[in-house]
């Protein structure tokens, strides 16, 4: 229903993805290569096909019903006026009864009742089973939603449908930290497992509770830049990225986070549109601009997460009809745009900018049929630019985005720079210069300047005396460039970057 986020069996591999034997082989082969495998952990909700929920439906007053949130309706209406993340009411009527069950996502994804201790213990047993197999950790999905306000109060409607966003109920709940600590102590902590939380709706003052030495997780994703294009009502009124706000937001997050620990830095993921289309101005949506965006992201303080296709510069697809989409959220946003008075063309354009399916089109391996992804029919169509943007072509081109990413990551992890880029401070620079994204990475031994021109005009940068040599620049991406720099200023053309020591 939701591309794998509706779990019907927590102890099995979905048939379309392979077998448990193949997964065990993956773990073994990864270990030989000193690599680690983490998996998605979806424990806010399960599938309506799960054995627990099927038993709950048969007896809405029985033991398994308490694994979920079954509530009586009010005056013939649902228990409260929450809108699910995918649109429509959060409450689904149980046929033949006066009860409803809660689903903050799709109706096929009933929320699990984390107030039930027996359920929690079953989840902990399942998590430890995977860790015992040799898994190194988890990306933990939608985890802050596990704590509900059990009064389920109504909120002021925020749209024409008379409903209120369900996250308002989550924000009104208290005590999620206690549940997360119990989760950690019963599972991850025992195995020294790596965890990265997908956390929205966290209060800023709660950051030290979520990351750092004693945090609930090893790290959490930094979604601060993604939130800049959140519309008040949906995708149809999502604002375009403003460079000054983007720069201020990212650097501000860096300064706040370093007080407590590390965040996981992203440009894109499976729930977001492609970063090259979202964050780069039109004049920079090219290989040079994509390398520039990758540079300023990968060299930030924190853990860089590189999503499939990002390393070759994949972009948003061109969608001709709402029927071409598979994503449930996209179809809901299309309906919301139409309901708000937009034309079909305008609604489709809004989805084209923001749809999650932009990041879910098949990986572009080659210029062969289906971009070399499969000989079968893929879930989604292939981006029509696959003949120009694909792995096979970029493998052969030393100046490609792919080979640049390899060089960038290798330098970040090199013996010379790994301490600096792991633990060094991030200090904003040239914040008053139009179009310039710049910062220093600094520790007791080294100081590196990263500077990029996102503008459409050349910019003059006045350098301080600490800049001695250029390590990498737009013009020098094939070899390690270690040449002396003796000039007091730097002339940076549009869509260019430098990395200086």
Give a label for each model feature:
Residues 24, 29-30, 303-306, 312, ...:
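Carbohydrate-interacting/catalytic domains
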């Amino acid at each position: 229903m939701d591309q794998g986020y509706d779990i019907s069996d927590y102890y099995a591999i979905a048939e379309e993805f392979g077998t448990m034997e193949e997964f065990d082989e993956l773990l073994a082969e990864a270990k030989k290569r000193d690599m680690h495998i983490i998996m998605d952990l979806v424990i806010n909700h399960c599938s309506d096909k799960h054995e627990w929920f099927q038993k709950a439906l048969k007896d809405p007053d029985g033991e398994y019903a308490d694994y979920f949130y079954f509530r009586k309706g009010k005056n013939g209406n649902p228990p409260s006026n929450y809108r699910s993340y995918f649109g429509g009411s959060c409450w689904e009527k149980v046929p033949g009864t006066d009860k409803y069950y809660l689903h903050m996502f799709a109706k096929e994804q009933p929320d699990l009742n984390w107030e039930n201790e027996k359920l929690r213990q079953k989840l902990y047993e399942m998590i430890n089973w995977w860790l015992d197999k040799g898994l190194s950790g988890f990306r933990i999905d939608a985890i802050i939603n596990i704590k509900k306000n059990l009064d389920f109060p109504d909120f002021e409607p925020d749209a024409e449908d008379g409903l209120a966003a369900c996250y308002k109920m989550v924000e009104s709940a208290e005590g999620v930290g206690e549940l997360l600590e119990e989760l950690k102590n019963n599972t991850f902590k025992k195995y020294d497992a790596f965890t990265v939380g997908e956390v929205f709706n966290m209060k800023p003052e709660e950051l030290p509770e979520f990351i750092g030495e004693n945090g609930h997780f090893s790290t959490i994703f930094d979604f601060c830049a993604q939130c800049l294009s959140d519309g008040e009502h949906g995708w149809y009124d999502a604002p375009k990225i403003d460079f000054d706000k983007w720069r201020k937001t990212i650097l501000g997050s860096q300064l706040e986070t370093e007080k407590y620990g590390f965040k996981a830095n992203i440009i894109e993921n499976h729930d977001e549109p492609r970063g090259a289309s979202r964050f780069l101005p039109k004049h920079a949506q090219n290989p040079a601009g994509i390398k520039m965006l990758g540079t300023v992201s990968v060299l930030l303080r924190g853990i860089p997460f590189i999503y499939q296709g990002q390393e070759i510069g994949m972009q948003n697809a061109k969608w001709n009809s709402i029927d071409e989409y598979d994503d449930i959220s996209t179809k809901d946003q299309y309906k919301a745009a139409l309901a708000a008075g937009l034309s079909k063309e305008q609604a489709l354009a809004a989805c084209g900018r923001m749809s999650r399916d932009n990041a879910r089109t098949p990986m572009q391996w080659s210029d062969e049929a289906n971009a070399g992804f499969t000989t079968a029919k893929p879930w989604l169509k292939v981006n029509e630019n696959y003949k120009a943007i694909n792995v096979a072509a970029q493998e052969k081109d030393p100046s490609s985005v792919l080979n640049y990413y390899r060089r960038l990551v290798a330098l970040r992890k090199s013996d010379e720079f790994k301490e600096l880029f792991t633990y060094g401070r991030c200090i904003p620079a040239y914040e008053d210069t139009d179009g310039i994204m710049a910062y220093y990475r600094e520790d007791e031994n080294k100081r590196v300047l990263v500077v990029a021109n996102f503008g459409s005009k050349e910019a003059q940068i006045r350098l301080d005396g600490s800049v001695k040599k250029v390590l990498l620049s737009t013009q020098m991406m094939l070899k390690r460039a270690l040449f002396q720099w003796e000039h007091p200023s730097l002339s940076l053309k549009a869509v260019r970057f430098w990395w200086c020591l």
